[in-house]
Amino acid sequence: MPRKGPVQPREISPDPVYKDVLVHKLINKVMKDGKKSKAEKIVYTAMKNLAEKTGDDPLTALHKAIENIKPVLEVRPRRVGGSTYQVPMEVPPRRQISLALRWLVEAARNRSGKGNYTMIEKLTNELFDAYNNRGAAVKKKEDTHRMAEANKAFAHYRW
């Protein structure tokens, strides 16, 4: 345990194009092997395509898509008297964003279809689906909420 108190979260600088921290976090999630310029190209093109599809501002569309993916509840394991219970808990705001971005990128990478889809097309389609409250990332959120709802009886074990 550190003696200097809780660790302060780092200040994340906004991205240069949209001047938004969420876009910067998405770029970092998409990035593989330190190839940031490639990740930026993927995200910016996907956002431009999303804006064309929705007819909305790209930043507004992204924020709405992320808002539709953010989980409010999740289950955490808690050991009580030799057995482990899945206890539903509220998700802190920072974790909501990080889970939403993780699920979005994961769903985009796992997305398949006929032909060779690029990551740009996959991310665009997944963002569009999330914008319209459907898709794999939104399903993951609903599954998480369903699991929390099913284990509501163990909510009194919260710590």
Curated annotation (Swiss-Prot):
The gene is rpsG. Belongs to the universal ribosomal protein uS7 family. InterPro entries: Ribosomal_uS7 (IPR000235), Ribosomal_uS7_bac/org-type (IPR005717), Ribosomal_uS7_CS (IPR020606), Ribosomal_uS7_dom (IPR023798), Ribosomal_uS7_dom_sf (IPR036823). It comes from the Bacteria. One of the primary rRNA binding proteins, it binds directly to 16S rRNA where it nucleates assembly of the head domain of the 30S subunit. Is located at the subunit interface close to the decoding center, probably blocks exit of the E-site tRNA. It comes from Persephonella marina (strain DSM 14350 / EX-H1). PROSITE patterns: RIBOSOMAL_S7. GO terms for biological process: translation. This is Small ribosomal subunit protein uS7. One of its GO terms (molecular function) is structural constituent of ribosome. Part of the 30S ribosomal subunit. Contacts proteins S9 and S11. Keywords: Ribonucleoprotein, Ribosomal protein, RNA-binding, rRNA-binding, tRNA-binding. NCBIfam families: rpsG_bact.
